[in-house]
Amino acid sequence: MLIGVGTDIVQISRIEKILHLYPELFAKKILTSKELKQFALLGKINHAAFLAKRFAAKEAVSKAFGVGIGQGINFKDITILNNDLGKPIVEVSSNYTNKLSPFNIHLSLADDYPVCVAFAVIESSYNVIRG
C-alpha cells in the first residue's frame, strides 16, 4: 500500500555558498554520524553536491511521510547511504515513523550542476485488502 510520494530539488550553488560561510556547521546540522564519515572521505570539491543530494533526499522522504522536515521528522532522523552498486538506501529513526512500520522507502537521486533532485516513494510492507 502506498504511504506517500515526495520530491525535492536543490541548487548546488546555494549549498556552496552556505558551505563557504559555515563549512562544518551546516554538514553537522544535516548529516548523521554515518553520513559525516562518508563526507569526511570526500574531496572538498564534492562536498556541496553530496550535501545538496542528502538535503534534497531528506526533504523528499519527509514529504513522502506527509510531514516535512521539522514536523515529526528531522534531518538527523534520516540517513542516506549507498549499497555496493551506488543505489541510495534510506534508514529512518523517528517516533513519528514507528506507527507506520514496517515500510519500504524507494529513493532516486540525480544531479547535474547546478541542481540536484530527489524522488522518494514510501510503501507499507503490509498488503491491505479493502472490502
UniProtKB/Swiss-Prot annotation:
Q: Which cofactor does it need?
A: Mg(2+)
In terms of Pfam families, this protein maps to: ACPS (PF01648)
* Localization in the cell: Cytoplasm
User: What's its EC?
Assistant: 2.7.8.7
Q: What is its main location?
A: cytoplasm
Q: Which InterPro entries does this UniProt record tie to the protein?
A: 4-PPantetheinyl_Trfase_dom, 4-PPantetheinyl_Trfase_dom_sf, ACPS, Ppantetheine-prot_Trfase_dom
Write out the catalysed reaction.
Answer: apo-[ACP] + CoA = holo-[ACP] + adenosine 3',5'-bisphosphate + H(+)
Q: Does the keyword Magnesium apply?
A: yes
Which UniProt keywords are present, listed alphabetically?
Cytoplasm, Fatty acid biosynthesis, Fatty acid metabolism, Lipid biosynthesis, Lipid metabolism, Magnesium, Metal-binding, Transferase
Recorded GO molecular functions are: holo-[acyl-carrier-protein] synthase activity; magnesium ion binding
Q: Which GO terms describe its cellular component?
A: cytoplasm
One BP annotation, GO: fatty acid biosynthetic process
Q: SUPFAM superfamilies from the entry?
A: 4'-phosphopantetheinyl transferase (SSF56214)
UniProt-annotated binding residues for Mg(2+): 8, 59
Family the UniProt entry places it in: Belongs to the P-Pant transferase superfamily. AcpS family.
Q: HAMAP family, alphabetically?
A: AcpS
Q: Which NCBIfam families match?
A: acpS (TIGR00516), pantethn_trn (TIGR00556)
Which purpose does this protein serve, as stated in its record?
Transfers the 4'-phosphopantetheine moiety from coenzyme A to a Ser of acyl-carrier-protein.
Query: What name does UniProt use for this protein?
Result: Holo-[acyl-carrier-protein] synthase
Q: State the organism named in the record.
A: Rickettsia rickettsii (strain Sheila Smith)
| Protein encoded by which gene | acpS
